[in-house]
From Swiss-Prot:
Protein name, as recorded: Small ribosomal subunit protein bS6
Gene this chain is encoded by: rpsF
NCBIfam families, per the entry: S6
Role description: Binds together with bS18 to 16S ribosomal RNA.
SUPFAM superfamilies, per database record: Ribosomal protein S6
Low complexity composition-biased segments: 123-141
Organism: Verminephrobacter eiseniae (strain EF01-2)
Family (UniProt): Belongs to the bacterial ribosomal protein bS6 family.
Length: 141
Protein backbone atom coordinates (compact mmCIF):
# COMPACT_ATOMS: atom_id res chain seq x y z
CA UNK A 1 0.00 0.00 0.00
CA UNK A 2 1.09 3.54 -0.70
CA UNK A 3 0.82 6.73 1.31
CA UNK A 4 -1.07 9.72 -0.09
CA UNK A 5 -1.90 13.27 0.92
CA UNK A 6 -5.21 14.57 -0.43
CA UNK A 7 -6.20 18.24 -0.42
CA UNK A 8 -9.88 18.98 -1.02
CA UNK A 9 -11.50 22.34 -1.75
CA UNK A 10 -15.17 22.12 -0.80
CA UNK A 11 -17.90 24.57 -1.84
CA UNK A 12 -18.29 27.09 1.03
CA UNK A 13 -22.08 26.57 1.16
CA UNK A 14 -21.45 22.88 1.93
CA UNK A 15 -19.27 23.49 5.02
CA UNK A 16 -21.91 21.90 7.26
CA UNK A 17 -21.74 18.70 5.18
CA UNK A 18 -17.95 18.30 5.53
CA UNK A 19 -18.07 15.83 8.49
CA UNK A 20 -20.53 13.58 6.63
CA UNK A 21 -18.39 13.72 3.48
CA UNK A 22 -15.29 12.81 5.50
CA UNK A 23 -17.06 9.84 7.08
CA UNK A 24 -18.17 8.61 3.65
CA UNK A 25 -14.61 8.86 2.29
CA UNK A 26 -13.15 7.23 5.43
CA UNK A 27 -15.63 4.37 4.97
CA UNK A 28 -14.49 3.90 1.37
CA UNK A 29 -10.86 3.79 2.50
CA UNK A 30 -11.55 1.35 5.36
CA UNK A 31 -13.64 -0.89 3.08
CA UNK A 32 -10.66 -1.17 0.74
CA UNK A 33 -8.30 -2.10 3.57
CA UNK A 34 -6.66 1.33 3.86
CA UNK A 35 -5.93 3.55 6.85
CA UNK A 36 -6.49 7.24 7.56
CA UNK A 37 -3.43 8.68 9.29
CA UNK A 38 -4.40 12.35 9.61
CA UNK A 39 -7.38 14.60 8.90
CA UNK A 40 -7.02 18.38 9.10
CA UNK A 41 -9.85 20.83 8.63
CA UNK A 42 -8.27 24.12 7.58
CA UNK A 43 -11.65 25.86 7.45
CA UNK A 44 -12.84 28.50 5.02
CA UNK A 45 -10.03 30.32 3.29
CA UNK A 46 -9.62 32.83 0.51
CA UNK A 47 -8.85 31.39 -2.94
CA UNK A 48 -5.99 32.78 -5.03
CA UNK A 49 -8.36 33.05 -8.01
CA UNK A 50 -12.07 32.52 -8.66
CA UNK A 51 -13.29 28.95 -9.06
CA UNK A 52 -16.88 28.65 -10.32
CA UNK A 53 -17.37 32.34 -9.43
CA UNK A 54 -16.41 31.65 -5.80
CA UNK A 55 -13.71 33.51 -3.90
CA UNK A 56 -13.64 31.22 -0.82
CA UNK A 57 -13.57 27.48 -0.23
CA UNK A 58 -13.49 25.06 2.69
CA UNK A 59 -10.09 23.30 2.78
CA UNK A 60 -9.42 19.75 3.99
CA UNK A 61 -6.17 17.78 4.18
CA UNK A 62 -6.29 13.99 4.54
CA UNK A 63 -3.29 11.64 4.78
CA UNK A 64 -4.10 8.02 3.99
CA UNK A 65 -2.54 4.66 3.24
CA UNK A 66 -4.37 2.83 0.47
CA UNK A 67 -3.90 0.78 -2.67
CA UNK A 68 -4.52 1.92 -6.24
CA UNK A 69 -8.07 0.51 -6.44
CA UNK A 70 -9.17 2.59 -3.44
CA UNK A 71 -7.50 5.68 -4.91
CA UNK A 72 -9.32 5.20 -8.20
CA UNK A 73 -12.61 4.91 -6.32
CA UNK A 74 -11.85 8.06 -4.29
CA UNK A 75 -10.84 10.05 -7.39
CA UNK A 76 -14.09 8.96 -9.05
CA UNK A 77 -16.08 10.08 -5.98
CA UNK A 78 -14.30 13.47 -5.90
CA UNK A 79 -14.88 14.02 -9.61
CA UNK A 80 -18.63 13.42 -9.46
CA UNK A 81 -19.31 15.25 -6.17
CA UNK A 82 -20.49 18.77 -7.04
CA UNK A 83 -19.42 20.06 -3.61
CA UNK A 84 -15.75 19.26 -4.34
CA UNK A 85 -14.42 22.24 -6.30
CA UNK A 86 -10.85 20.91 -6.67
CA UNK A 87 -8.81 18.01 -5.34
CA UNK A 88 -5.12 17.21 -5.36
CA UNK A 89 -3.58 13.84 -4.54
CA UNK A 90 0.15 13.59 -3.84
CA UNK A 91 2.09 10.36 -3.33
CA UNK A 92 4.18 10.40 -0.11
CA UNK A 93 7.15 8.20 0.79
CA UNK A 94 5.95 7.56 4.36
CA UNK A 95 2.94 8.18 6.58
CA UNK A 96 2.56 11.76 7.78
CA UNK A 97 0.91 12.05 11.19
CA UNK A 98 2.19 15.35 12.59
CA UNK A 99 0.50 18.70 12.00
CA UNK A 100 1.14 20.29 8.61
CA UNK A 101 2.66 23.74 8.14
CA UNK A 102 -0.76 25.04 7.10
CA UNK A 103 -2.38 23.68 10.27
CA UNK A 104 0.29 25.37 12.38
CA UNK A 105 -0.57 28.64 10.61
CA UNK A 106 -4.29 28.11 11.26
CA UNK A 107 -3.62 27.41 14.96
CA UNK A 108 -1.41 30.51 15.18
CA UNK A 109 -4.17 32.67 13.64
CA UNK A 110 -6.77 31.24 16.05
CA UNK A 111 -4.46 31.92 19.02
CA UNK A 112 -3.85 35.50 17.83
CA UNK A 113 -7.60 36.14 17.42
CA UNK A 114 -8.32 34.66 20.85
CA UNK A 115 -5.62 36.77 22.50
CA UNK A 116 -6.90 39.91 20.77
CA UNK A 117 -10.44 39.16 21.92
CA UNK A 118 -9.11 38.62 25.45
CA UNK A 119 -7.25 41.94 25.38
CA UNK A 120 -10.30 43.82 24.14
CA UNK A 121 -12.49 42.53 26.96
CA UNK A 122 -9.96 43.28 29.70
CA UNK A 123 -8.80 46.70 28.47
CA UNK A 124 -11.69 48.90 27.34
CA UNK A 125 -11.00 51.00 24.29
CA UNK A 126 -10.80 54.78 24.75
CA UNK A 127 -13.91 56.53 23.53
CA UNK A 128 -13.91 59.86 21.65
CA UNK A 129 -15.31 61.53 24.80
CA UNK A 130 -12.18 60.46 26.72
CA UNK A 131 -9.98 62.23 24.18
CA UNK A 132 -12.02 65.45 24.43
CA UNK A 133 -11.81 65.46 28.23
CA UNK A 134 -8.03 64.92 28.26
CA UNK A 135 -5.97 68.02 29.09
CA UNK A 136 -4.33 69.75 26.15
CA UNK A 137 -0.60 69.26 25.71
CA UNK A 138 1.91 72.10 26.07
CA UNK A 139 0.86 75.32 24.33
CA UNK A 140 2.89 76.44 21.39
CA UNK A 141 4.28 79.95 21.64
Amino acid sequence: MRHYEIILLIHPDQSEQVPAMLERYKGMIAAGGGKVHRVEDWGRRQLAYLINKLSKAHYLCVNIEADQAVMAELEHAFKFNDAVLRHLTVHKKKAVTGPSAMMKTVEREEFRKASQAGNQTTAPAASPADHAAAPASADRS
